Amino acid sequence: MELLFLGTGAGVPAKERNVSSVALQLLGERGATWLFDCGEATQHQILHTAIRPRRIEHIFITHLHGDHLFGLPGLLGSRSFQSGETPLTVFGPKGIRSFVETALAVSGTKLRYELNIVEIDEGVIFDDERFSVIAKRLDHGMPSYGFRVVEKDLPGPLLVERLQALGVRPGPIYQEIKQGKTVVLDDGTVIDGREFVGPPQKGRIVAVLGDTRFCEAAIELARDADVVVHEATFAAAEQRLAHDYFHSTTTDAAEVARRAGAKRLILTHISSRYQGEAALQLVAEARSVFPNTELAVDFASFSIPRG
């Protein structure tokens, strides 16, 4: 599991930062990539990475401002020409269906794969045997959502050495034991599978938040997260400006991570006014509140290990 940032700027494309998009790479977990937001030229950014559009399974749109959305029709269309045949689901606020369907219809774009569009509200918006995704509305003056991706706990490892000490040889019986079943050996020995399986492996939590002021919903989404991706459009000194434009400062983001008990914070959605030393100062401001903070740049990747 890793995060790969495709666009980390705010508002409009800039020379050093494209507009918003981040990929959650789940290649080992499910052979898929999930995108969060799809600003203009996201598919151009993808060309400079190892991401394969045909592996994009879900796209989550935080809100309908253009810098988070305008790259979506092009990416959906291009996926058809890049061997994309598996279904893809777009999740987003009310209006996302009209936007996508109109763009595809007016441009005469025909998709070779099944496209599902889900207009979301708060709550669980996706759930399967491995992951769930929870959405909550943030404070941005228009419907803007944050997403909490929860990896479900994995079964503990089979304690092979203990089984071998009892003379239990590898075979189909190992699978039964790993499932916690009670099995009877050829010599009549009864084995309780639960005693030969280690503790469950704790699933990881990733919170990806859309544009927002500081708010309690952001804290709830980030609670105990392994990684929080939070906008930091403005420096701490621009608190009034951030509030007026429904955005966050560096210290707003850091305070969310601190109150949530998160492990790690990654800042994104950075105004183009902050370059070079000014950008480094943003990190310093956030670290004064939440030390384990990093600043995303385009094409930066962050591994998310277990534990």
From Swiss-Prot:
Enzyme Commission designation: 3.1.26.11
InterPro entries: Metallo-B-lactamas, RibonucZ/Hydroxyglut_hydro, RNase_Z/BN
An MF annotation (GO) of this entry: 3'-tRNA processing endoribonuclease activity
This protein's name: Ribonuclease Z
Subunit note: Homodimer.
Catalytic activity: Endonucleolytic cleavage of RNA, removing extra 3' nucleotides from tRNA precursor, generating 3' termini of tRNAs. A 3'-hydroxy group is left at the tRNA terminus and a 5'-phosphoryl group is left at the trailer molecule
Family annotation (SUPFAM superfamilies): Metallo-hydrolase/oxidoreductase
Domain of life where this protein originates: Bacteria
Cofactor note: Binds 2 Zn(2+) ions.
Signal peptide start and end residues: none
Family: Belongs to the RNase Z family.
Key words of the record: Endonuclease, Hydrolase, Metal-binding, Nuclease, tRNA processing, Zinc
Binding residues for Zn(2+) 1: H63, H65, H140, D211
Record-listed Zn(2+) 2 binding positions: D67, H68, D211, H269
